[in-house]
Structure formats: structure tokens, C-alpha cells
Amino acid sequence: MTAHEMAKGILESVQSLKPKKERNLIAIAGPPGAGKSTLAEIVTDLMNENLMKTSLVPMDGFHLDNKTLKRANLLDRKGAPETFDVKGFTELIKNLRYKRNLSVPLFDRSVDEVVKNARKIPAEQEYIIAEGNYLLLNKDYWRDLYNYWDYKVFISVDKNILKSRLIERWLSENHTYSEAEARVLKNDLVN
């Protein structure tokens, strides 16, 4: 199934949600390299094309900064559940339920840091699509998110395909093949 076919199925399911005063929150989760970001962007575009006012909120905007990770000896594990500000993300999701103007942080991969207030979420938005690895994780503080989602999607992909995609991702960021493979095996696939 292609990302566009999946997106159309998600659109149809979301269109069947009962209307309510609060925003509908949709979670798209899965491992690194599964295609969450691509799928979330396609779904967001489709929903907006269908006059469903929708904004996208990536979980990656809640990476802890590199200094904090270094102090905690977690820099080599960046991307693991404990390397995110899960309490801050949960608070944002609580606030996104209500139709008011908000700003959300985004992760800038080119500088490996979070950019605060990088995306504006206008009050008139009716749907929020959140995407990230741990949105449906049943562990520690992450499990507190589960009941906020009105619709949930988990993308499952064969581990060999993930490995190949993740190595390509690191190669595109000017890492050697051995560096890329080491990062994928030591960190990305573990996450």
C-alpha cells in the first residue's frame, strides 16, 4: 500500500469522527524510518484540500537539547524515549485540544536542534495531526498521551526496510556508510 493510499484511508476514517467543540487529535506513530513524517504531511494536505482545517505537529520538536543530553550521558541515544521532553509534549497536546492560537517547536535536522515557536497553530484549526515514534508507547509518561487521541495510526515496517531507509537518511547527511550503519544499528533500530 502506498503512502497516498494509506492517507486516503485515514482521511475517510477521520471524516467519520463525530463533530465536537474541541479539536480532533490524530496520532501517527511508528519506528524511525517508517514513513511517519511523509504520511502525516500527505494526510494534512489531503485534509486541508477537503476543507478540514488541519495542522501538523511533529513530536521531534520536543527533543531535549544536546547540552542536556550530553550532561545526562544520553547524546549517543538521541531519539530514544528518555531523550524527549515528554511532559512538555503532553502539556502541548492537552492545550491543542482547545481551539486557541498556539505556537509549537520544530526540530531542524540541519543544525540538530529544536527551533522554539517555529510553527503557528491558528485557533480556527479543527484537526491536529501529531507524528512521532512514541505517541502510542505504553511506557512511563508516554502512556499518558494515549487517551488524548481521537484516531490512532501505527505504521509497521519490516526491519530490513527500516535499516535500508535509515542508512540512506544518514548517507544523505554526509556520513560514510560505516558511520551511517553504526548509527542505525546502535541507536535508530533500537528506538
Question: How does the language model describe each region?
Answer:
Residues 112-169:
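ATP-dependent NMP and nucleoside kinases share a basic, alpha-helical "lid"
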